A protein has these predicted regions:
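N-terminal intrinsically disordered/low-complexity leader segments
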Residues: 1-9
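Helix-turn-helix
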Residues: 13, 17-55, 59
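Hydrophobic alpha-helical connector segments
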Residues: 59, 70-101, 146-153
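Short, basic, alpha-helical segments at the C-terminal edge of helix-turn-helix-like DNA-binding modules
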Residues: 62-67
């Protein structure tokens, strides 16, 4: 009797491999052929799970975003760090964070022309804003305009992450953390 195949698990594994290729070499590296080779599958196996490259790339994006969310959630439940410090886990302060940002930034040009991906990007941005808003309120329950300040903080986080992704030597984890903490203090005044 053939071994049972967990199709969701295999689909997730292919999405993870595509994300790994994107992190290492950019979107152009994540062809169906390259992903199949990296997975040790035929292209037929990959196309069984994904109708085309676009569907595979969308799954890779979702995998990366959900992994970053999972990392944040795990940190939030595992440690006593203050809420604003926990948000630092969303920055490229280590290899896992740098990988996530390299993937995320590869999709920006696509989201400009792909409505489904743009919707996905907007949802994750709104999710990030809500995580930040909740942290700001937790640190300072009497904060005024928590929504507006959360949007500003998300912009700060994005700016730090972009700089650190493109200039990791100039933006080590210590500088990212110091900049994030300083900007959050300004918002909480």
């Amino acid at each position: 009797m053939p071994a049972a195949v967990d199709h969701d698990e295999k689909r997730d594994a292919i999405a993870r491999i595509a994300a790994d290729l994107i992190a290492a070499r950019g979107l152009d590296a994540a062809t169906i052929r390259q992903v199949a080779a990296a997975a040790g599958y035929s292209t037929t196996v990959v196309t069984h799970y994904f109708a085309n490259k676009r569907a595979m790339l969308l799954a890779a994006y979702r995998h990366a975003a959900e992994s970053a969310q999972g990392r944040f959630d795990a940190l939030a439940t595992e440690c006593n760090a203050d809420p604003l410090s926990r948000l630092e886990s969303l920055l490229p302060i280590d290899e896992e964070g740098r990988r996530a940002w390299r993937i995320y930034l590869q999709y920006w040009p696509l989201a400009d022309h792909d409505e489904e991906l743009a919707i996905e990007q907007r949802w994750w941005s709104a999710n990030g804003t809500e995580l930040i808003r909740a942290a700001l309120v937790q640190v300072c329950p009497e904060i005024d305009d928590a929504d507006g300040k959360a949007a500003i903080a998300l912009s700060v986080l994005l700016g730090i992450a972009i700089q650190a992704t493109f200039d990791p030597a100039g933006w080590p984890a210590s500088r990212q953390s110091a900049m994030w903490q300083a900007q959050c203090k300004l918002l909480l005044r």
